[in-house]
Structures are given as C-alpha cells and as structure tokens.
Amino acid sequence: MAIPALAKGETKMAVFGTTPDGVSVPIYTLTSGQIEVRVTAYGAHLVSVKAPDRSGKMADVVLGYDSLEGYLADNKTYLGGIVGRYGNRIAGGKFTLDGKTYQVPTNDGPNALHGGPKGFNQYVWKSEEIPGGVEFTLVSPDGDMGFPGTLTAKVRYTLKGDTLRIDYTATTDKPTVVNLTNHAYYNLHGDDQGNILDLKMELNADRFTPVDKTLIPTGELAPVAGTPLDFTKPEVIGARIGDDFPQLKIAGGYDHNWVVNGKPGTLRLAAIVTDPVSGRKLIVETTEPGVQFYSGNFMDGSFTGRHGVKYTKHAGLCLETQHFPDSPNHPDFPTTTLNPGQTMHSTTTLTFGVMK
C-alpha cells in the first residue's frame, strides 16, 4: 500500500551532527513511496525505518537516537551499526592465520565482540549517493584492533518499494578474517511501544550452533527440533524464552546463531517476524550461512532513544545475518578468511510488509 506522504525514489542528505574532533557527519533519508529509511555515515548506522501498519499508519520500527550524540555516547548496544571487522565473538580474541596468532583486544568478558573495543560502528565512513541509495566506504588499516591487512569495506543501502537491500563487500592486501553485519534492533509495534515478546518469529533453520557459558560456539551444529530454539513454524517470542533450557539460561534469552537452510551464497529466506496487532511483517533474506537472533537480553535502560524511551530488556530484537561466531577457530565452519585478490560479498534484504 503506497503512502501518499512519502515521495517516491528520493534520497536527501542533511547534517546529522559533528564529532568531537570536528568531522561533519551526514544523514541520508531514502524514500520509496512505501517506506522511509534513514542511514548515517557514522558507523554506517541504520537509524530508522518508518513502515505502515495494516491501516496505513506509519511507525518507526527500528530503535535509534534522535541525534549523533546518542550514537557517540552508546558504546554498548551497537544500535543499528555495521559491526566489524569481525561481527560477533572470537574466543579469547585470538585466532591463527597462516601459522601466525593474532590478538584482538577483548571487550566481552574473555572474548572479543564485534571487532573489539573500537569496531566499525564507531568510525565515520565515507559516503556517496548512488541510484536508489547510499554507499559507505571504510578503510581499516593493517593492525586495526589487532587484525592483519588493510581492509577496504563497502556497505550499500538501496531502497526499492518496501525492501531495503544491504550489500557488503570487502577486499584486503593481506590474509585476514572478516564478518560484517548490521546490528539493527527491530520492534514492529513501533520503537516506543514496549517490548518484542508478543511478536511472532519464524526462522528458516533446522540447526543452530550451541554455545558455552561465554557464548562461544562449541563447534556442534545441533538440531532445533524439540527445543525452545525451534522456530521452523511461527512462534511467539516470549512463549518459551524463560524455559528451563540450558542454552536459554546461558544467554538470558535468545542470543544464538541459527544455520540458515539452503545454499550459502544464494539469497534465501532467513526469518519472518510478524506483529498480529499492527499487521506489520518483516521478511529477512540473506546470502549468509547464519543469522543471529538476539532478543535484547542485555538492554538495561541505561540508554534513552527517540521519544525519550529508555531501551530496557527486550525493547527490540536483532537478526544479524552473518558467518558463524568464532569461525576463525572452527575449521569446520564456513570460512571467514579473505585473501588478497578476493572480494567478500554478501547481500541481505529487509522487506517491511503487511500481513494478509
């Protein structure tokens, strides 16, 4: 359903704010006539997505901040940012590549999370308007957060109809590891309308990667059947989140990597989230082998988003399309190694529709 208030196919740039060292940061508004998307060069963040409910009423369904200052102050939630060089966890922050061991500073207990203490979400990316959207570019130097090789990462956001497409590419001048994803938090009720526990989740995944007590994969690919992690049919998120199941106890809810069915490298369904009340629906497709469903377990109200809303536990959910956590230390997992002359490329699409 087209929303007359939204212009079709427009991209507008404005100044979002200025960093403490004086860098002006742009924000871009993309409109399609159906939804409106805002992205910024700081961390290549997805700032907002306004989408209609079944009656055409618009709401922002992505958690975010009104100003750049909110993102500069938040070093904890990764709210809508592009995380890298290695999204998700690396055990002990250590990995070995071509016989050499590298150390990433730890920032999540004993492990490195989302690229270490200063990940890609904390840099100002170069930006360029392209047909239908924006391309952001970041050059991460050799040794950045302990990772080898100068990595050139590009993230493209393009909007067509009710679908936001995110394309990731990366090249390197030395062998390295890379795992890029977007860490948006979604709430289909609206970003100021309580928690996500009554939304329904469906995951196109028959297996998941169980984790140890520090949320590092054990290396097993376990079936979801018969567990509270079975979302092969739509399930209310909050229905089983408190079950006495060891994997849920470890994470305080859902914070696991599901193995997406189908062939990695091909665009296929990963997840469907629905809100029976508003009628809003989010369909996630990806070329990645996995998707991390995180139910906002560690949000504690210490950050205040748009509308003056404190983001408390389960305020939003993440669907981080990705290679598996700690892949550099698991040779049996799909590889995250990138060599000179190769280009890493992955695509994720987010379709914001309405239930029929």
PLM regions and their residue ranges:
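An exposed, glycine/acidic-rich loop-and-rim segment of catalytic or binding clefts
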Residues: 3-356
